Amino acid sequence: DWLKAGINVNLSYQKYNTTTFGTEANSVYNKAYAARIYRPDQTINEILTDEEGNFTGYGKRLDYFDDMGYYNPYYLAELQPNDRSTVRINGNTFFNINPIKGLNIRTSQAVDAFDYRNSHKAYPEGPFEGAGVASESFERYYSFTFTNTAEYKFSLSDKHLFTVLAGQESIITKNENFSATSKKMVDSRMMLMAAGAESEVPIHSMYDKVFNSYFGTISYSFADRYYVDLAARRDGSSLFAKNNQWANFYSLGAMWDMRKENFLQNVSWLNSLQLKVSYGTTGNSGISAYNALALVGSGLLYNGQPGIAPSTVGNDNLTWESMKTLNVGISTRVFDRFSVELEFYNRQTDDMLMGYPLSYTTGHGSSVENVASMRNRGFDITLGVDILKTRDFSWSVSGNLNYNKNEITKLFNGLDEYTLPDTGLKMKVGKPWGEYYYVKWAGVDPRDGYNTWYDKNGNLTKSYSEEDAVFVGKQRYAPWSGGFGTQFGWKGISVSADFSFMLGQYMLNNERFFTENPTFAGSDNQTVEML
């Protein structure tokens, strides 16, 4: 029993075909807007009529819908096939050693890898300009994870229990892409890359990234009532600037199991009562590779010749995004039937990793930088009730509610606010992220039919100006969210239903742009508001 080892490997192969224009027929919901204007029967065949125009049946399949301006997806699949295949492997191995009592040494290795191929053809007889094209693209990806830990459990007496763990983990990821296109092919029977009279510049890209971590934890419990957990880790990522690749994080947590105290032993209706508090820091490295480096890229043409040009600005100060979190909670169960869990939290996020806008005179639109700080405060409450419990039957209900108050606390370059172009959003210190920033519409003037708006000072105007945009008091992210559910059980058979909800979230109704717009009256049904 002192040595254990294992291996698990999964291998899969997937092959499928798609059209190049997979959404040529557009969204399935569009038929609700255009059914009466286009073809109510939704057929894809020619409609046959007699001399008086009466329907007599269906003829051959239509390859192009004149009234809609779309090609038949079946037709596209025949003339522009897209063949894709993926080979994927997931595997892991481990070795577990127990040299002495309480000591567990474990090493594990895992791999996630795939090889993807896409073969696209556009036969010369196709109706599209530039037909007679073949392209091949490949992608190879693999990620290796190496984890090594040593855990030691011991006690100083029956009341003092310790668990000490030290570990190291490395994640190595590599990705490579290649694609090439050949044009001006004349025979659909010879759609090989070498058969084209003209070739595009091949595209070849690759990236490597490495994540290393050293960590340790100490867990202590006293008298099976008081618990303390300490954790520390040092993380390093190749995604950041050379002098900022490493960062330290830590956490501290404590829990008091009050139900086991002597002064509560005789409280029969109280099943459990626990108080807990924790504080810790974590890091985020969720950016793409090489943003910290000033790079040049290829795939560009100048005067018909291949060339290179700057592709990323680089940032010598790019570092980890960090989050500090405080949690305070209480949980209890009473009468062996009712359970309640309440938790308050405060999360402060600093050095947020975001795209920082640059003047186009620099030759770049943006650069990834540590640009802002944000705070989230709120609470979570979970309730549960066992309505009925018998030997064969059980019925329970549960629900949860979350409230989160979000606030931007800092922006880049000392700015107090920044408008995100073409998004209807504005970042402002003291405001939540995601509050809409628009010019308020005041309706249509019935005297002349013109739109009216509110300017920044709340006055009516018929002159629309982006300068009159204001915060409208509505958010794209819900401050309230939750859910509820119920579960029935009978002799080992269970049935459950779960529901979720959000309150205070607003979304743009883009459908109204088409269904309440005279410009689209010829192609989309209009709502009664347009009468």
Which residues fall in each region the model found?
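Transmembrane beta-barrel architecture of outer membranes
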Residues: S213, A247-S251
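Short glycine/threonine-rich loop-to-helix capping motif typified by GTGT followed
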Residues: K242-W246
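Residues on the lipid-exposed face of transmembrane beta-strands in outer-membrane beta-barrel proteins
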Residues: D1, G91-I97, N148-Y152, A166, ...
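Transmembrane beta-strand segments that form the barrel wall of outer-membrane beta-barrel proteins
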Residues: V228-S237, D386
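Surface-exposed loop/interface segments of Gram-negative outer-membrane beta-barrel transport/assembly proteins
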Residues: W2-R88, R106-N212, L239-A241, M258-T325, ...
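Short, contiguous hydrophobic alpha-helices characteristic of membrane insertion segments
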Residues: G216-A232
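Conserved C-terminal beta-signal and adjacent last beta-strands/turns
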Residues: S396, Q475-L503
